[in-house]
Swiss-Prot record:
Intramembrane features from the record: 359-383, 751-771, 1197-1218, 1488-1510
Chain segments carrying region Disordered: 32-52, 446-468, 901-957, 1765-1786
Biased composition (Polar residues): 446-467, 923-933
Organism whose genome encodes this protein: Danio rerio
Keyword terms of this UniProt record: Cell membrane, Disulfide bond, Glycoprotein, Ion channel, Ion transport, Membrane, Repeat, Sodium, Sodium channel, Sodium transport, Transmembrane, Transmembrane helix, Transport, Voltage-gated channel
Domain notes per entry: The sequence contains 4 internal repeats, each with 5 hydrophobic segments (S1, S2, S3, S5, S6) and one positively charged segment (S4). Segments S4 are probably the voltage-sensors and are characterized by a series of positively charged amino acids at every third position.
Tissue specificity comment: Expressed in skeletal muscle, brain, spinal cord, and eye.
Alphabetical list of Pfam families matching this protein: Ion_trans, IQ_SCN5A_C, Na_trans_assoc
GO molecular function, one term: voltage-gated sodium channel activity
Segments crossing the lipid bilayer: 125-143, 151-171, 186-203, 210-226, 246-265, 391-411, 583-601, 613-632, 647-666, 669-686, 703-721, 783-801, 999-1016, 1030-1048, 1063-1081, 1090-1108, 1126-1145, 1236-1257, 1321-1338, 1350-1368, 1381-1398, 1412-1428, 1448-1465, 1541-1563
Record topology, Extracellular segments: 144-150, 204-209, 266-358, 384-390, 602-612, 667-668, 722-750, 772-782, 1017-1029, 1082-1089, 1146-1196, 1219-1235, 1339-1349, 1399-1411, 1466-1487, 1511-1540
Location of the protein in the cell: Cell membrane
Ranges in the topological domain labelled Cytoplasmic: 1-124, 172-185, 227-245, 412-582, 633-646, 687-702, 802-998, 1049-1062, 1109-1125, 1258-1320, 1369-1380, 1429-1447, 1564-1829
Protein name in UniProt: Sodium channel protein type 4 subunit alpha A
Length: 1829
């Protein structure tokens, strides 16, 4: 920032007068004249970013004088000095910039009207008035039924907006010139709003409600009024711009997947179970006879087949389902019940909107799948209709589409935010530097003692400013009312002595850290006089620290500092001593934990006694916390007490607790009890991770201020738009979506419900509400609105939220904790306790030794221990004086302490002892932190790595540890002779066996076989006796093999090595389970419950594969490293959720019960059944039940389950409906009676779900980055082999540039080669591919035969065209065709297309397999993928995916392993549960395939609520324990609720929260890497482009072009290598080598243009080596070329020649003049002494040389000039006249080239160039010279 420092003070502000305008016009004229003279424009300046319109005036300018405020002033930005602008500065020092042109062509800037308008416009009250108007207007817009007088109010609003626009137009002008009304895009919004208001008022445009929606844009006006919002909207727009590539790729991928879906599943979702055969036998006979005779039914027949199958009464419906049951005709599809057959009939599911019948609906289905909204429904419908095999399609779409592309959007938004953040920080740093330079300048101006004081003040303030940049946002800093940091010295002082001594005064002045001295009265007066110059410039810095009004100090001294008398001060000291003791802190923490436990023990139903105990407990805890607050107030004084954040927090909670006790019996205020829960947050004081989480949320919410406002505006706008557009439709067409014609829960008829729908869309749930909307209001408008909310709100703004959250994580904050070297009081107390226990142990040990008569030899240590204990206790007493602040504000008080110790060196040495003791304590007890916060160990090699790095031992190690051998001498064996030698030989043999590769391979094979065997033990095993017997024997064999393996390893490795390896332990435990199970079977105890449950643990067998497969092992190692951090966050999340769970119990316990009709499962209305007793009375006469919602808030455990369902948005609707309908305990719920309970769920979703679940992504990414840096930046998810693949992929990315394909010598081939090499040909083929894609999109399920025929013919044409293209390329490119990857791809696609065309006929005729037919048709979609070839951005993203593949494969393996294990568990435990909710004949745990399908669904957290519900059935009447399962002895269809909840929760945490987030972490990292590579100035595409352009200039592939064509070639390149014409000078200066024949080599040109882009950097050197190496590799046989000259050298030679010519021509001119003079004197007979000889000799010599050595035009001209007769009386022309005279002379060279025209000037300068240029008198000499050069 090399800008000159602007002048300080107010002298820069000058009124804008007519003279100022004249001066601007003069400067503009001067600038244009200068440009004309110099012939080139000046470097464009940029306006100062500090002086932009809308920003505050920088403090360096000071405050403008009052009379210059709100007055037009001359522009202070140098950039605008030559532009017609002026500025006005408002009272808040905000800059406004206006055009000085007359507004509307008539109102000059000096007009009273315009000045008045400007004053109104910039006044803060005007902005406030407009803001209030907009907010009021927004309130009126939310009214669904506005009152009659609202029309008048509407006119008022329109009038106000018109007035605002008029003021703006009068003050700024309308649209001509800068800074006018329409030049600001935000004003377009105003213009549109006002125009629409008048248009709708005066022109009848029909649909009024639709036009009223335009009014909602007024809400966007808030963005124009609030300054910070414009910035954040700018950032959003930037992120959207950056998302274009990802968006294109996403849409392209969606289109491809939609086409695949269209081909595979077209029409499948209409296959329903139809009642068949028809009961009426006659109709059936008619139908049957017609079918047999192969004729269709006659229209006159009575039986209407179409009407029959479309009649819903003939279709099979499941209980409670809105759509008929789907089915399929393939073997693994859904089956129909008896009496029904599968036919295509009726409409598609979900009002007909879920289908693949045409491209549009298929695209919507795939978008829904990609955004994972209710995709389990689509998954279940498709698999039921098409078959389970098609799960593969969903796996690909979920992993590629949902996990990869959706997270790419997150990556792009995060990147855009980071860039924005970087730019902001850079700007702040620049300002800081400029400010510091200014301070230096100001300091230099000051002299004497005043100057020194001033500089001290400046430094102090400057340091404050620097600190503010790196503020840690800690709430724990102790500040006084001025906002200044209060030193400990003052906080802890309780004596009445308030004056500093002179010595202390001096010390405090000498310390730069103490900031108190400037506030002392005498000093501040002197300083003020010294700083009078700086007052204006420094004022901005004091904003944050403005002192309180003087009255407050008196008030504080009198009432807030309790220092009344000596006894009170003594009492206060004692209270301080007790309250600040670490043990009191420990006690309070224990009370907080106990209080939390007491609150968590509330449940329904509770016995009165238990309720009483909890009530008393609450009173006790409230008393304890109140007492703590009171004592702290006494100890610290209110003045200092309320300067600690935690104390304020405590006081608020205590006050609320006391208020709640007082209002305990008031109805409706029970919610106050919830505030007690906030005490849990007090744990954050002593729990760093919780503290850190709260800080992250705090920082994010702080940073999100503006973004939250933008999101609120978006939500508001869309809620109002929805209400205005669709509200009436919901009311009028409600019967379409509701059986009882009542409004459903989700509608847009009023603002609140409309807001809830928009919020639900932001949560990612949009499809179900959109179906309702489309049904009542039409598809098109609903699609547009819902998609806009989804894309803008969810994908952009919410991802920006997440990006902010991720950016809140810094390096080690989750694992390192608060490593500030100080411990909190809790740690000190625990340290004391442990030391006390150690001391007691030592005491007991010494007493025992004395009793036994041994003399203790540790007297010295004991003495030292006493000293240490004394020192530590003494230290603790010292710390008590520090109080609570010691652990709250360590980072800010350390420097102060250091300064004090510097000046107080002569104090008692006791303090230094304390310091030493303190240091010892901190070092020794750092482990206390590690129990809470995992700290990664120093980078030591892990066991596996050690094995890899060090040579493995050739012989077995010792069996036992040295300790064992010392204690048991018999374990020591001599291995040199006897039994010992035999034992040693046996061990060596075993060692050789287990180390052999064959043994390891065999064991892996056995593990895979035994795991595979488990998959067969499904529900059908009892019916397959043979398989069951085989599996039983196999199980025994596997067990024996694994036991033998374990014994071999014991003998080979020894117990020491075996049992110190974690993987061996895993093997040992799994073998033990098999062993116990086998033993129990042999003894006949296999039916025991314990043994049965133990048998399920066999599912862990596949875990043994972990250590054998390196790919999985590296992922598990990385995961194990992350477990402490993940566990930490999980614990913090559980604490966070505990608050919401307890609150839920307080609000909803026992209130979810309701009375239902057991036959219809519907709730009985409240007017029939009011409460539980009414229901019980009905129970004896009717089929009714008083039931609870299965997932509820009756206790904290169930509350947690409810919150997990809400956080994953699965099953949350039922919970929310129950909450909103709830009344009181034992009362029948009523529809939406408790409407605002929705807010509980909204708040939890924001804080509990959004923040905490996304925290997992943050912690995983953060932890893996740490591990990566620990291992030196290596990828921790890849094996060594995979790293080789990764590097190979990287090399492929930077592949060598192919050698240009030589043009064939054959004429016809050459013509074809030229044709296919043209860009037009590529564009033509791309257009055809797009058209082909369009024709595929046109296909529909119910298309006519004609349409099908036409599409078939079109497809035929495309196949012919693409085949022709392939043949042409093969013909022209010869063998080189297959050297290009894309050509091979095209070739394969063409072959497949032809094969598909031929096979489709054969399949249709001979094999009726529609599935196979469809799969073959997919080959056509391959053509679409060719489009990728043309898109650089998309290739980058796909390359990032290719780079991610090895790591993703490893994670996929781990995920499959987890799914495998859990599916075996599921088969063991949940195979026989009742089929209801999410469990049916396809989705269940009966077989391994079904289990895998269910678990794949849950991997994305989808549908787990439906699978859990049947498992929660624990007994009658929900399920039947005696239910007989056919084909097996197992009875009952009840679930196991405890096991089910554990199973699903653990799987969701492991897969959805951990493994899937690892997947996301890898994608983000690889995307960043790919972006960094593509963000390089040059990439491989640029070099490819260079080659393509080169081929056009060097058709014969000689690798050379002529020097004259160089300039055209470089101009023909694309950015960034292109150098546009005129480029002659630039290229000449590049010093490019030229070889014989005036030719230049391609490599030299490439190096030159590359250097131009990269500059002389290290990258350039590397690039040069790479290019040269590749060239040598590509052209091993090419002849070497030696440059004879370079472009720059040639130019220098030309210049030298011209210089010589110029000198010589001057000499000739002088000669000619002398000759003329000689001739004249001769005629006049006047002789000169020197005129002995005529001066023509040189001319004669030159003429002779010209004759001998060829024609030289310059010389010829000179000679001609020399011999041309001159008039005797002619005067030599003036230089200016000669300059304006031009002549164009062209002379032929001997080689036949044209030479340059000669330009005649006063110096007779003759220049040459390779082109002929005709000069005319109007052209500027300088311009022509430059163009020639």
């Amino acid at each position: 920032m090399a800008r000159l420092l602007p002048p300080t003070g107010t002298s820069v502000f000058r009124r804008f007068t007519p003279e100022s305008l004249v001066e601007i016009e003069r400067l503009i004229q001067e600038k244009s004249t200068r440009e004309e003279l110099e012939g080139a424009e000046e470097e464009p300046q940029a306006p100062s970013s500090d002086l932009e319109a809308g920003k505050c005036l920088p403090m360096i300018y000071g405050d403008p004088p009052g009379d210059l405020l709100n007055t037009p002033l001359e522009d202070i930005d140098p950039f605008y000095k030559t532009q017609k602008t002026f500025i006005v500065i408002s009272k808040g020092n905000t800059i406004f910039r206006f055009s000085s042109e007359p507004a509307m062509f008539c109102i000059s800037p000096f007009s009273i009207v315009r000045r008045g308008a400007i004053k109104i416009l910039i006044h803060s009250l005007f902005s406030m008035f407009i803001m209030i108007t907009i907010l009021s207007n927004c309130v009126f817009m939310t009214m669904s039924n506005p009152p009659a007088w609202s029309k008048t109010v509407e006119y008022v609003f329109t009038g106000i907006y018109t007035f605002e626009a008029t003021v703006k137009v009068l003050s700024r002008g309308f649209c001509i010139g800068p800074f006018t009304f329409l030049r600001d895009p935000w004003n377009w919004l105003d213009f549109m709003v006002i125009s629409m208001a008048y248009v709708t008022e005066f022109v009848d445009l029909g649909n009024v409600s639709a036009l009223r929606t335009f009014r909602v844009l007024r809400a966007l006006k808030t963005i124009t009024v609030i300054p910070g919002l414009k910035t954040i909207v700018g950032a959003l727009i930037q992120s959207v711009k950056k998302m274009i590539d990802v968006m294109i790729l996403t849409i392209f991928a969606l289109a491809v997947f939609a086409l695949i879906g269209l081909q595979l599943f077209m029409g499948n979702l209409r296959q329903k179970c139809i009642r068949w055969p028809i009961l009426n036998s006659t109709i059936f006979d008619v139908y049957n006879s017609n079918m047999v005779n192969d004729t269709t039914l006659n229209v006159t027949d009575t039986f209407d087949f179409k009407a029959y199958i479309n009649n819903e009464e003939n279709q099979y419906f499941l209980e409670g389902s809105l759509d008929a049951l789907l089915c399929g005709n393939s073997s693994d599809a859904g089956r129909c019940p008896e009496g029904y057959t599968c036919m295509k009939a009726g409409r598609n599911p979900n009002y007909g909107y879920t289908s693949y019948d045409n491209f549009g609906w298929a695209f919507l289905a795939l978008f829904r799948l990609m955004t994972q909204d209710f995709w389990e429904n689509l998954f279940q419908l498709t698999l039921r209709a098409a078959g389970k095999t098609y799960m593969i399609f969903f796996v690909v779409v979920i992993f590629l589409g949902s996990f990869y592309l959706i997270n790419l959007i997150l990556a792009v938004v995060a990147m855009a935010y980071d860039e924005q953040n970087e730019a902001t920080l850079a700007e702040a740093r620049d300002k800081e530097e400029e400010f510091q330079r200014l301070l230096e300048q100001l300091k230099n101006q000051e002299t004497g003692s005043k100057a020194s004081l001033a500089s001290q003040k400046t430094q102090s303030r400057g340091s404050n400013r620097t600190g503010s940049l790196h503020d840690l946002a800690d709430e724990d800093v102790i500040k006084d009312c001025n906002g200044r940091i209060v030193p400990r010295l003052i906080v802890n002082r309780v004596s009445s002595n308030k004056e500093l001594s002179a010595e202390e005064d001096q010390k405090s002045l000498s310390s730069k850290h103490s900031m108190q001295y400037l506030d002392q009265p005498k000093l501040s007066k002197r300083t003020a006089s010294a700083l009078s110059v700086l007052t204006a410039t420094m004022e901005g810095l004091e904003d944050a620290q403005r002192p309180c009004p003087p009255g407050w100090y008196k008030f504080a001294d009198m009432f807030l500092k309790w220092d009344c008398c000596a006894p009170w001060i003594l009492f206060k000291k004692w209270v301080h001593f007790v309250v600040m003791d670490p043990f009191v802190d420990l006690g309070i923490t224990i009370c907080i934990v106990l209080n939390t436990l007491f609150m968590a023990m509330e449940h329904y139903p509770m016995s009165p006694h238990f309720e009483h105990v909890l009530s008393v407990g609450n009173l006790v805890f409230t008393g304890i916390f109140t007492a703590e607050m009171v004592f702290k107030l006494i100890a610290m004084d209110p003045y200092y007490y309320f300067q600690v954040g935690w104390n304020i927090f405590d006081s608020i909670i205590v006050t609320l607790s006391l208020v709640e006790l007082g209002l305990a019996n008031v109805q409706g205020l029970s919610v106050l009890r919830s505030f007690r829960l906030l005490r849990v947050f007090k744990l954050a004081k002593s729990w760093p991770t919780l503290n850190m989480l709260i800080k992250i949320i705090g920082n994010s919410v702080g940073a999100l201020g503006n973004l939250t406002l933008v999101l609120a505006i978006i939500v508001f706008i869309f809620a109002v738009v929805g209400m205005q557009l669709f509200g009436k439709s919901y009311k009028d067409c409600v019967c379409k979506i509701s059986e009882d014609c009542e409004l459903p829960r989700w509608h847009m008829n009023d603002f609140f419900h409309s807001f809830l729908i928009v919020f639900r869309i932001l949560c990612g749930e949009w499809i179900e509400t959109m179906w309702d909307c489309m049904e009542v209001a039409g598809a098109s408008m609903c699609l547009i609105v819902f998609m806009m909310v989804m894309v803008i709100g969810n994908l952009v703004v919410l991802n920006l939220f997440l990006a902010l959250l991720l950016s809140s994580f810094s390096g080690d904050n989750l694992s390192g904790g608060d490593d500030d070297g100080e411990m909190n009081n809790l740690q000190i107390a625990i340290g004391r306790i442990t030391r006390g226990i150690d001391w007691v142990k030592a005491l007991v040990a010494s007493m025992v030794q004395r009793i036994l008569g041994k003399k203790p030899d540790n007297t010295k240590e004991e003495g030292e221990g006493d000293i240490e204990l004394y020192a530590l206790n003494h230290l603790d007493e010292g710390k008590m004086a520090d109080g609570l602040t010691n652990c709250l504000s360590p980072t800010l008080t350390v420097p102060i302490a250091r300064c004090e110790s510097d000046v107080e060196e002569d104090e008692d040495s006791e303090s230094s002892d304390e310091e030493d003791a303190k240091a010892t304590l901190n070092d020794g007890d750092s482990s206390v932190c590690s129990t809470v916060d995992y700290q990664p160990p120093e980078p030591e090699p892990e066991p596996e790595e050690v094995e890899e790095e060090e040579p493995e031992p050739e012989e077995p190690e010792a069996c036992f540890t040295e300790g064992c051998i010392r204690r048991c001498a018999c374990l020591s064996v001599d291995i040199t002779e006897g039994w010992g030698k035999k034992w040693w030989n046996l061990r060596r043999t075993c060692f050789t066996i287990v180390e052999h590769d064959y043994f390891e391979t065999f064991i892996i094979f056995m593990i895979l076989l035994s795991s595979g065997a488990l998959a067969f033990e499904d529900i059908n095993i009892e019916r397959r006796r043979v398989i069951k017997t085989i599996l039983e024997y196999a199980d025994k064999v596997f067990t024996y093999i694994f036991i033998v393996e374990m014994l071999l390893k014991w003998v080979a490795y020894g117990f020491k090595t075996y049992f110190t390896n974690a993987w061996c332990w895993l093997d040992f435990l799994i073998v033990d389970v098999s062993l116990v199970s086998l033993t129990a079977n042999l003894m006949g105890y296999s039916e025991l419950g314990a043994i049965k449950s133990l048998r399920t643990l066999r599912a862990l067998r596949p875990l043994r594969a972990l250590s054998r497969f390196e790919g999985m092992r590296v992922v598990v190692n990385a995961l194990v490293g992350a477990i402490p951090s993940i566990f930490n966050v999980l614990l913090v999340c559980l604490i966070f959720w505990l608050i919401f769970s307890i609150m839920g119990v307080n609000l909803f316990a026992g209130k979810f019960y309701h009375c239902i009709n057991t036959t219809t499962e519907e709730r009985i209305p409240m007017d029939v059944v009011n409460n539980k007793s009414d229901c019980m009375a009905l129970m004896y006469t009717n089929e009714v039940r008083w039931v609870n919602v299965k997932v509820n808030y009756d206790n904290v455990g169930l509350g947690y389950l409810s919150l997990l369902q809400i956080a994953t948005f699965k099953g949350w609707m039922d919970i929310m409906y129950a909450a909103v309908d709830s009344r009181e305990v034992d009362e029948q719920p009523s529809y939406e009676i408790n409407l605002y309970m929705y807010l509980y769920f909204v708040i939890f979703i924001i804080f509990g779900s959004f923040f905490t679940l996304n925290l997992f992504i943050g912690v995983i990414i953060d932890n893996f980055n740490q591990q990566k840096s620990k291992f030196g930046g290596k990828d921790i998810f890849m094996t060594e082999e995979q790293k080789k693949y990764y590097n190979a992929m990287k090399k492929l990315g930077a592949k060598k540039r192919p050698k240009p394909i030589p043009r064939p010598s054959n004429i016809i081939q050459g013509l074809v080669f030229d044709f296919i090499s043209k860009q037009f040909f590529d564009i033509f083929i791309m257009v055809l591919i797009c058209l082909n894609m369009v024709t595929m999109m046109i296909e529909t399920d119910d298309q006519s035969a004609e349409k099908e025929y036409v599409l078939y013919q079109i497809n035929l044409v495309f196949i012919v065209v693409f085949t022709s293209e392939c043949v042409l390329k093969l013909f022209a490119l010869r063998q080189y065709f297959f050297t290009i990857g894309w050509n091979v791809f095209d070739f394969v696609v063409v072959i497949l297309s032809i094969a598909g065309l031929m096979l489709s006929d054969i399949i249709e005729k001979y094999f009726v397999s529609p599935t196979l037919f469809r799969v073959i048709r997919l080959a056509r979609i391959g053509r679409v993928l060719r489009l990728i070839r043309g898109a650089k951005g998309i290739r980058t993203l796909l390359f990032a995916l290719m780079m991610s593949l090895p790591a993703l494969f490893n994670i996929g393996l781990l995920l499959f392993l987890i799914m495998f294990i859990f599916s075996i568990f599921g088969m063991s435990n949940f195979a026989y549960v009742k089929k209801q909710a999410g469990i049916d004949d396809i989705f269940n745990f009966e077989t391994f395939g079904g289990s895998i399908i269910c678990l794949f669904e849950i991997t994305t957290s989808a549908g787990w609520d439906g699978l859990l519900l049947p498992i929660l059935n624990s007994g009658p009447p929900d399920c039947d324990p005696d239910f007989e399962n056919p084909g097996t002895d197992v009875r009952g269809n009840c679930g196991n609720p405890g096991m089910g909840i554990m199973f699903f929760c653990s799987y969701i945490i492991m897969s959805f929260l951990v493994v899937v987030n690892m997947y996301i972490a890898i994608i983000l990292e690889n995307f960043n890497n790919a972006q960094e590579e593509s963000g390089d100035p040059l990439c491989e595409d640029d070099f490819d482009m260079f080659d393509e352009t080169w081929e056009k200039f060097d058709v014969d592939a000689t690798q050379f072009i002529e020097y004259d064509r160089l300039f055209d070639f470089v101009d023909a390149l694309q950015e960034p290598l292109r150098i546009a014409k005129p480029n002659r000078l630039k290229l000449i200066s590049m010093d490019i080598p030229i070889v014989n024949g005036d030719k230049i080599h391609s490599q030299d040109i490439l190096l030159a243009v590359t250097r131009e882009v990269l500059g002389d950097t290290i990258e350039m050197d590397a690039m040069k080596e790479s290019i040269e190496a590749k060239f040598i590799m590509n052209n091993p046989t090419s002849a070497s070329f030696e440059p004879i000259i370079t472009t720059l050298r040639r130019k220098e030679e030309e210049r030298a020649a011209i210089a010589v010519q110029r000198i010589y021509r001057r000499h000739l001119l002088k000669r000619a003049i002398r000759y003329a003079c000689f001739m004249r004197r001769s005629k006049r007979k006047v002789r000169n002494p020197n005129d002995n000889e005529p001066p023509e000799t040189e001319g004669l010599i030159a003429r002779k040389m010209n004759t001998l050595y060829g024609s030289n035009p310059e010389l010829a001209m000179a000679l001609e000039l020399e011999t041309r007769p001159m008039r005797p009386n002619s005067q030599p022309p003036k230089p200016s006249q000669v300059t304006q005279t031009r002549a164009s002379v062209t002379f032929p060279r001997p080689q036949g080239q044209l030479i340059l025209p000669v330009e005649l000037t006063s110096e007779v300068i003759l220049r040459s160039a390779p082109i002929t240029h005709s000069l005319n008198s109007s052209e500027n000499a300088t311009t022509i010279k430059e163009s020639i050069v």
